[in-house]
Amino acid sequence: MPISALHGDMVVSRGDNLGWSAAWKINLYGRLGDGESAYRILRGLETEISIHPQRDDSDRVPSMEGNQGIQAFTAGIAEMLVQSHASEIELLPALPKEWPTGSARGLRARGGFTIDVVWKNGSLSSATVQAKYAGECRLRCAVPVRVLHGNREVQGRRVDANVTEFATEANAVYSITPQP
């Protein structure tokens, strides 16, 4: 059984309660690529526990140990949109169907990268990758992508159908679009 399946079983067996661990479960489901489960908990926190302005609308009081809960909550959203592990940046790894269109700016990835991402109809529309350092960027996306630096197409290497690797220059910005 793959390690992700074991972790997924552990998260599922503990349930989707909205107590102090809920914000961390958003992160765990996001890391496992399960955007629907992450969204279900996120939505529960928003509607069933009063993190919204009208505290009187809920009979449940939030239990998010100070800033820790809010940090985990926002980190979970970021985890649903961009992940960077094993020298790879993955765009929209756990996008729930409830977010068919949207954007995020300034998401950080390992290796000194800053990511902006836009999606429409549940799929990548465009992204930018800003490299702080010169080196390699390995990008994973559900659709094959094209990489531009300014108006010039960057010659990358297709590692597999969903992974493109390309060289970066320090402080350069790269535009990412789905291949036509």
Where is each model-derived feature located?
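Active-site core of glycosidic bond-cleaving carbohydrate-active enzymes
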Residues: 1-84, 88, 125
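Catalytic cores of secreted or luminal carbohydrate-active enzymes
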Residues: 67-116, 120
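Residues that act as N-cap/strand-start positions at coil-to-secondary-structure junctions
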Residues: 101, 111, 123, 133, ...
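Short, well-ordered beta-strand segments enriched in hydrophobic/aromatic residues
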Residues: 115-117, 124-131
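Short, exposed beta-strand/loop patches in secreted or surface proteins that constitute
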Residues: 118, 155-158
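Surface-exposed beta-strand/loop patches in extracellular or lumenal glycoproteins
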Residues: 128-144
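C-terminal beta-strand-rich structural cap/linker in extracellular carbohydrate-active enzymes
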Residues: 157-180
